[in-house]
From Swiss-Prot:
Swiss-Prot/TrEMBL keywords: Amino-acid biosynthesis, Cytoplasm, Histidine biosynthesis, Lyase
Entries under CDD domains matching the protein: IGPD
GO biological process: L-histidine biosynthetic process
Catalytic activity of the protein: D-erythro-1-(imidazol-4-yl)glycerol 3-phosphate = 3-(imidazol-4-yl)-2-oxopropyl phosphate + H2O
Taxonomic lineage from the root: Bacteria, Pseudomonadati, Pseudomonadota, Gammaproteobacteria, Pseudomonadales
EC number annotated for this UniProt entry: 4.2.1.19
SUPFAM superfamilies given in the database record: Ribosomal protein S5 domain 2-like
Family: Belongs to the imidazoleglycerol-phosphate dehydratase family.
Protein name: Imidazoleglycerol-phosphate dehydratase
Amino acid sequence: MVERKASVERNTLETQVKCSINLDGSGKARFDIGVPFLEHMLDQIARHGLIDLDIECKGDLHIDDHHTVEDVGITLGQAFAQAIGDKKGIFRYGHAYVPLDEALSRVVIDFSGRPGLQMHVPYTRATVGGFDVDLFQEFFQGFVNHALVTLHIDNLRGHNTHHQIETVFKAFGRALRMAVTQDERMAGQMPSTKGCL
């Protein structure tokens, strides 16, 4: 099987991001981003997606977390697009429901080649540990725009904002894992009647 790995660097006047991924990993993760809550959530993607992730970012955190969070999402999306290749033989679609105590979230993804995000998370607080939770919309928008995926995120219930977010990221990791898995019966075939994605 061809290795499905990618390393991407993205440099702007606001951030310098390096991202390496292995879609067929074991969930190993290393982060040096400077935003602890974001790193905690990225760890959920790696662990539950069985994707090896290594991300470094030097960003303008003296202003706020916005550029760093968005640009990490963009760079991760670019890395996914590169690692997934021509998409032949993958399941393409992935979905997961994940609970954490009172919280329950659903994530559905399609490696369609068409970027689109529907994110419905009724946060009960504006911040968690000083982190502006609205920035996760920017993270996922950056990801879908550059991974070229359609992504539906719904927090179905929950009143602890940390739990709401953590269930979203765990479900995202598990949906990714399902979608990028190689289907032996589809070996060498494009998972689309169009013949391309």
